[in-house]
């Protein structure tokens, strides 16, 4: 099946190729999950009971549970947006140290967010288990959606941590390694040689002997003539 030329151009577009990267896909999923979590609990997470007009959290009437989920979802959503924007300009970064620092920060935050969402899932599921759904007419579906997406956010952030670790490992640990190797090549080229025409060996009775471009450990010195005593005849 032959695709139109416009679709080929769309597939080769830089923006489309950027969005098809595994890291970009994981960030988009993490951001969408976080958006649904905090928006659903922020709108339908606080309801009033049938016998009271006071608003309460649908998760066992625990205000801390709803506040924790809303705050974590909002901060996680902002984190995904910020890192997605930095990824778009990652190729324009020329500083190697800045790239390594950014990838290290990405890895640390991904591990932290994976732990946060695991704790959030356990906490929200425990509060939902102890809550009575008959007390609230609305908000049950929002609570279930927040619990489910909290669970699915854990593998998403683990994937982001793995991808960040891969990028961090691919970077050269010593940025000046290549310059050191080039410097050693230059030094080896400029080292004196015993067969170099610019340093020919010196021959003569009072000359010093050179072996392999290094001075001999023992230097020979001419001995002074000795006076011999002749017997009287």
UniProtKB/Swiss-Prot annotation:
Predominant location: membrane
MARVEL domain mapped to chain residues: 18-169
Keyword rRNA-binding: no
InterPro entries for this protein: Marvel, Synaptogyrin
Residues spanning the membrane: 25-45, 66-86, 104-124, 145-165
Membrane topology listed for this record: Multi-pass membrane protein
Biased composition regions of type Polar residues, renumbered to the chain: 204-219
Domain of life: Eukaryota
Localisation: Membrane
Spans annotated as Disordered: 191-233
Keyword tags: Membrane, Transmembrane, Transmembrane helix
Record-stated family: Belongs to the synaptogyrin family.
Protein name per UniProt: Synaptogyrin-4
Gene that encodes it: Syngr4
């Amino acid at each position: 099946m032959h695709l139109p030329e416009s679709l080929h151009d769309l597939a080769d577009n830089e923006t489309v190729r950027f969005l098809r990267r595994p890291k970009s896909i994981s960030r988009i999923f993490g951001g969408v999950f976080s958006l649904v979590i905090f928006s659903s609990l922020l709108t339908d997470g606080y309801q009033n009971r049938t016998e009271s007009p006071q608003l309460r959290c649908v998760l066992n009437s625990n205000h801390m549970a709803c506040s924790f989920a809303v705050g974590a979802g909002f901060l996680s959503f902002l984190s995904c947006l910020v890192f997605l924007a930095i990824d778009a300009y990652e190729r324009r970064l020329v500083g190697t140290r800045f790239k390594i620092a950014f990838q290290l920060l990405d890895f640390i935050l991904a591990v932290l967010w994976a732990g946060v969402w695991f704790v959030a899932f356990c906490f929200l599921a425990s509060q939902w288990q102890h809550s009575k759904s008959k007390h609230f007419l609305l908000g049950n579906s929002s609570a279930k959606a927040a619990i489910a997406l909290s669970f699915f956010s854990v593998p998403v952030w683990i994937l982001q941590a793995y991808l960040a670790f891969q990028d961090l490992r691919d970077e050269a640990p010593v940025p000046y390694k290549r310059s050191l190797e080039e410097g050693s090549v230059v030094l080896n080229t400029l080292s004196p040689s015993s067969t170099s025409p610019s340093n020919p060996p010196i021959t003569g009775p009072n000359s010093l002997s050179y072996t392999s471009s290094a001075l001999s450990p023992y230097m020979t010195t001419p001995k002074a003539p000795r006076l011999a005593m002749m017997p009287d005849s």
